[in-house]
């Protein structure tokens, strides 16, 4: 009986390992992959722009602090250096709300850009009132006038304004590349009391983007892409 029990338990362990291996080997390709989309391998010179979205005090010292905000900002600065090296335009985006609003109030301090992310004189600055920068600015008109076909997207928050920009850029015929670690978000507690932590929300947003709207890479991968 003991011998049978040992053999039975051993068989269960082996079955469990095999089942686990099978589960881990299972893949769920993105819609873009199934449609034949090829991951970006280079960026076209003169046709690529960098979007730097909402690196504002609200997300650092305001009512919506993002723990990974400083790291995302540091990586966005690396992307700006990369853009400068290859003469890519850098568009800074700032979200604004009416005076007296709880967040991003135009007459408050937290609506201002973070001290370490100040637009230069040469950088266009767009002020938006919608989640997506394309919804309340003339960004599309500006990009098309400049001959831009590819946009690198960075900013805060991943699930909102970054995903919104990617979602709107794709049907406007832009090739979208989101910088995963130059973006970040915060944990959210819903009205029903359920909470989603920042990492789960960040990863879910990136998965949504990669599924249907564009490529997702880390900053180190992006700055290694040839520009030609």
Regions found by a protein language model. Name each.
Residues 58-61:
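Short acidic, Gly/Ser-rich segments with clustered Asp/Glu that frequently serve as metal-coordination loops
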Residues 64-83:
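…and closely analogous acidic/polar surface helices at protein-protein or active-site interfaces
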Residues 55:
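Active-site-proximal loop/short-helix segments
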């Amino acid at each position: 009986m003991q011998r049978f029990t040992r053999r039975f338990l051993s068989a269960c362990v082996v079955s469990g390992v095999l089942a686990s291996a099978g589960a881990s080997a299972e893949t769920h390709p993105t819609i873009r992959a199934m449609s034949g989309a090829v991951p970006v391998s280079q960026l076209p010179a003169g046709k690529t722009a960098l979007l730097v979205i909402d690196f504002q005090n609200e997300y650092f010292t305001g009512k919506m602090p993002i723990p990974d905000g400083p790291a995302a900002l540091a990586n966005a600065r690396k992307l700006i250096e990369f853009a400068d090296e290859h003469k890519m335009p850098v568009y800074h985006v700032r979200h604004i709300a009416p005076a007296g609003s709880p967040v991003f109030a135009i007459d408050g301090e937290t609506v201002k850009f973070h001290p370490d992310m100040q637009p230069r004189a040469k950088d266009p600055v767009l002020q938006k009132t919608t989640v997506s920068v394309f919804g309340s600015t003339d960004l599309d008109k500006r990009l098309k006038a400049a001959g831009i076909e590819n946009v690198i997207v960075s900013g805060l928050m991943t699930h909102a304004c970054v995903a919104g920009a990617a979602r709107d850029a794709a049907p406007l015929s832009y090739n979208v590349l989101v910088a995963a670690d130059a973006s970040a978000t915060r944990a959210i507690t819903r009205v029903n009391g359920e909470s989603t932590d920042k990492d789960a929300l960040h990863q879910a947003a990136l998965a949504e983007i990669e599924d249907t709207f564009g490529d997702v890479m880390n900053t180190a991968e992006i700055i290694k892409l040839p520009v030609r």
